[in-house]
UniProtKB/Swiss-Prot annotation:
One of its GO terms (biological process) is deoxyribonucleotide metabolic process. GO terms for molecular function: ribonucleoside-diphosphate reductase inhibitor activity. It comes from Schizosaccharomyces pombe (strain 972 / ATCC 24843). InterPro entries: RNR_inhibitor. It is found in: Cytoplasm; Nucleus. This is S-phase delaying protein 2. Regulates the ribonucleotide reductase activity. Keywords: Cytoplasm, Nucleus. Pfam families: RNR_inhib.
């Protein structure tokens, strides 16, 4: 028999849960930043302001997208992984000192 415990909406989460959620959020943000740096190294021409706008495949479908918008809003979506780097980044992401390393 399973029971579900529901916290009242106005109550704060326990400290342990708050800490865990904060840690997960921080790690996700750091992983996106790391992936974005990796993306810039792999595709440097995508991140230059003088890039031909037709070079970006997303912009062929929507000419209103500007390169600056893509840099900011689609940073997470523009991460292109290769298989060797995926494991390396996953390993570094799992290390306890990951947040201090970059």
């Amino acid at each position: 028999m399973s029971e579900t415990f529901k916290l009242p909406d106005h109550d704060e989460l326990p400290q342990l849960v708050q800490t865990t959620l904060f840690d997960v959020g921080a790690r996700v943000r750091k992983a996106v930043q790391t992936g974005y740096k990796f993306d810039q190294q792999l595709f440097p021409s995508y991140h230059k302001d003088q890039t031909d706008r037709n070079e970006l495949p997303q912009q062929k479908h929507d000419p209103n997208l500007r390169l600056d918008d893509l840099k900011q809003e689609l940073a997470a979506d523009s991460i292109f992984w290769d298989t060797a780097s995926t494991q390396e980044i996953a390993d570094s992401f799992a290390k306890p000192d990951f947040l201090k390393s970059h």
